[in-house]
């Protein structure tokens, strides 16, 4: 039986530097990933159920399977992205001795060094994502560029902060060459409590283990 997913609803509006029009367009694009993921899961399930995986249709099955990684990751990464934004805008950089700031200091030497690295990755040429991951076995943070949605994901690492840097995330508000301005706007809208929950959830799981 094929797995089915429902598009989530996100209560986001009045962000700083990211228009509601951009958000509405982005939500619709996300819903498209959900629909395509469901379609692919259904088609793949039919191939398996009918025993057609090793037959002459194998090339088609292979392409469906490869495509699933693109659509599914596109769906999930957008959910992480929307979840780490705060309606009405955030407060900028985290203040005080937060769990994330402490993790950034332990992993990079300081929060500012971590941020400079993350922003630098977000400015890289290409289409994809900048993601801060936590290594669950070490508790260390690291920043990575993900091409499209799936190439470069670090197996076993947990996404803690996810930034979409596809042009669709900002093209209505900024020119392609102005991606740094979008990144600045992104940081002014981060919901650090959501980021903390991701980090603390992993920490709690490690302690419980």
Describe each PLM feature range.
Residues 1-209:
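Feature for soluble, non-membrane regions of globular proteins
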């Amino acid at each position: 039986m094929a797995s089915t997913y429902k598009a989530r609803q996100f209560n986001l509006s009045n962000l700083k530097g990211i228009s509601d029009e951009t958000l509405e367009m982005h939500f619709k694009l996300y819903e498209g990933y959900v629909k395509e993921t469901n379609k692919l899961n259904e088609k793949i399930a039919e191939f398996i159920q009918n025993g057609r995986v090793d037959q002459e249709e194998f090339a088609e099955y292979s392409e469906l399977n490869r495509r699933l990684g693109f659509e599914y990751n596109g769906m999930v990464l957008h959910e992480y992205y929307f979840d780490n934004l705060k309606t009405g805008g955030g407060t900028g950089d985290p203040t005080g001795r937060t769990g994330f700031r402490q993790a950034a200091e332990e992993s990079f030497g300081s929060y500012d060094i971590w941020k400079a690295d993350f922003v630098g990755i977000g400015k890289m040429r290409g289409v994809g994502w900048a993601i801060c991951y936590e290594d669950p076995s070490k508790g260390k943070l690291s920043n990575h560029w993900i091409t499209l949605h799936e190439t470069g994901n670090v197996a076993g690492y947990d996404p803690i902060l996810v930034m979409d840097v596809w042009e669709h995330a900002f093209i209505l508000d900024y020119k392609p060459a102005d991606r740094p301005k979008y990144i600045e706007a992104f940081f002014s809208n981060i919901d650090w409590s959501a980021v903390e929950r991701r980090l603390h959830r992993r920490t709690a799981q490690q302690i419980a283990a």
